[in-house]
Amino acid sequence: MAVTLPKPKLRNLYLPEQVNQESMNKLTKAIIEINEDDEYLKKLYAVHGIEYKPQPIQMYIDSYGGAVYQCFGLLGVMDKSETPIHTIVTGAAMSCGFMILISGHKRFGYSHSPPLY
């Protein structure tokens, strides 16, 4: 009898706005939930003799920055994330947006999306 194992959560996160308490809370919560889900799936897959390797979180950034202190909480969560986080600048990555961009485990950008510190 074949066992159907659950699939992981969606991994695309978006920051198309100013950095503020609300936007940082959304991203922080999403990263924590994905990490919790991946930890559960690793254990569940192991019970069935299958190795579970989580796919990276893709965080798309288009932000002119904003509240630095609220940003620090997200940066800490990103740093401790067991699931790799790939940050991609799609438009602007300025001020806090730049700090988020460089905190990704891997960093990417489109050719017409220069970051600004």
What are these regions (language model features)?
Residues 1-117:
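Terminal-region recognition feature
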